[in-house]
C-alpha cells in the first residue's frame, strides 16, 4: 500500500510499531546475549583467549563468559577430552538451563585429534557425550574462525522454533559415558605394524567401571576404545 494515502499521524504510528511474534523476539534476545561457559583443556583455548582483546572484541556479540554453568547458555569445549573428564563435562552440560548450545572447537575435541589412534583415555569426539550444534575444525582454529562459528550459531538460533528445540533436547539429552574397553595385543613390540592400528579386538569387553580394578592384570596389553 502506498504511504501517500496515510496521514502524517498514521505514518508516524506505522513507523513506530514493530510487529513480531514471541518466538522471534525470544530468538533475537538469545542470539544477542550468548553467555558462554569456557571449557578449555588444551592449546585451542589460547586462540579463544585472543578474542578478549580489542582486535577482535567479542563483546560486540553479547558474549559474557560465566564461571557457573547455571548462568550460561553456551558451552565451548576446546582441547582434548579424556574419559576421566567425561562425567564432569556431562554434569556441567546438564546444569545449564534450557535452551543451551555447544560449540566443539578444535580437532582434538571433534575427533580426538592426534591422540585418537593409540590413546586409551581419549574420547573420540565430544559428541559422544553431549549434542554439538557447531563443529569448528582446526589445530588450532584461528580467532576469525571462532567468530564465524559464533555467527553460524546466531543464525541457527534466529531460525529455530523454541518448542521444537525443547522437545528435541528432551529426546536427546546426552550420550552415555559408560565407555567400553577392548583388550588388544600390545603394539610396543619394537616393530612397526600398521595393521595393529585397525585390528579388531577378539577378546571380551571390559566395562569402564572395572578398568582400574583390573588395570594391573592387563598392564601388558593395550586398551583401545
Swiss-Prot record:
Species the sequence originates in: Oenothera argillicola
Main location: plastid
Gene Ontology, cellular component aspect: chloroplast thylakoid membrane; respiratory chain complex I
E.C. code: 7.1.1.-
Cofactor binding remark: Binds 1 [4Fe-4S] cluster.
PANTHER family reported for this sequence: NADH DEHYDROGENASE, NADH DEHYDROGENASE [UBIQUINONE] IRON-SULFUR PROTEIN 7, MITOCHONDRIAL
Name by which UniProt lists this protein: NAD(P)H-quinone oxidoreductase subunit K, chloroplastic
Family: Belongs to the complex I 20 kDa subunit family.
MF terms (GO), sorted A to Z: 4 iron, 4 sulfur cluster binding; iron ion binding; NADH dehydrogenase (ubiquinone) activity; quinone binding
Lipid bilayer topology: Peripheral membrane protein
Subcellular locations according to the entry: Plastid, Chloroplast thylakoid membrane
Any one GO BP annotation for this protein: electron transport coupled proton transport
Cofactor: [4Fe-4S] cluster
General function of this protein: NDH shuttles electrons from NAD(P)H:plastoquinone, via FMN and iron-sulfur (Fe-S) centers, to quinones in the photosynthetic chain and possibly in a chloroplast respiratory chain. The immediate electron acceptor for the enzyme in this species is believed to be plastoquinone. Couples the redox reaction to proton translocation, and thus conserves the redox energy in a proton gradient.
NCBIfam families hit by this protein: nuoB_fam (TIGR01957), PRK06411.1 (NF005012)
Keyword Hydrolase: no
Enzyme class: translocase
UniProt keyword list: 4Fe-4S, Chloroplast, Iron, Iron-sulfur, Membrane, Metal-binding, NAD, NADP, Plastid, Plastoquinone, Quinone, Thylakoid, Translocase, Transport
Complexes and interactors: NDH is composed of at least 16 different subunits, 5 of which are encoded in the nucleus.
Pfam families assigned: Oxidored_q6
Catalytic activity: a plastoquinone + NADH + (n+1) H(+)(in) = a plastoquinol + NAD(+) + n H(+)(out); a plastoquinone + NADPH + (n+1) H(+)(in) = a plastoquinol + NADP(+) + n H(+)(out)
Source domain of life: Eukaryota
Residues reported to bind [4Fe-4S] cluster: 43-44, 108, 139
Amino acid at each position: 500500500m502506498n504511504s501517500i494515502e496515510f496521514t502524517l499521524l498514521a505514518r508516524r504510528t506505522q513507523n513506530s510499531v514493530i510487529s513480531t511474534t514471541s518466538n522471534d523476539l525470544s530468538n533475537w534476545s538469545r542470539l544477542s546475549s550468548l553467555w558462554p561457559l569456557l571449557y578449555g583443556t588444551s592449546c585451542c583455548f589460547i586462540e579463544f583467549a585472543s578474542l578478549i582483546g580489542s582486535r577482535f572484541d567479542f563483546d560486540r556479540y553479547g558474549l559474557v563468559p560465566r564461571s557457573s554453568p547455571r548462568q550460561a547458555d553456551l558451552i565451548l569445549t576446546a582441547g582434548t577430552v579424556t574419559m576421566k573428564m567425561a562425567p564432569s563435562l556431562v554434569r556441567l552440560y546438564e546444569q545449564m538451563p534450557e535452551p543451551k548450545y555447544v560449540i566443539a572447537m578444535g580437532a582434538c575435541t571433534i575427533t580426538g585429534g592426534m591422540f585418537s589412534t593409540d590413546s586409551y583415555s581419549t574420547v573420540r569426539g565430544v559428541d559422544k557425550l553431549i549434542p554439538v550444534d557447531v563443529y569448528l575444525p582446526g589445530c588450532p582454529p584461528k580467532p576469525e574462525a571462532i567468530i564465524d562459528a559464533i555467527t553460524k550459531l546466531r543464525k541457527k538460533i534466529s531460525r529455530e522454533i523454541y518448542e521444537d528445540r525443547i522437545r528435541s533436547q528432551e529426546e536427546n539429552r546426552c550420550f552415555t559415558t559408560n565407555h567400553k574397553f577392548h583388550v588388544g595385543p600390545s603394539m610396543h613390540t619394537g616393530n612397526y605394524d600398521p595393521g595393529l592400528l585397525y585390528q579388531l579386538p577378539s577378546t571380551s569387553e571390559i566395562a569402564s567401571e572395572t578398568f582400574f580394578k583390573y588395570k594391573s592384570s592387563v598392564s601388558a596389553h593395550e586398551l583401545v576404545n
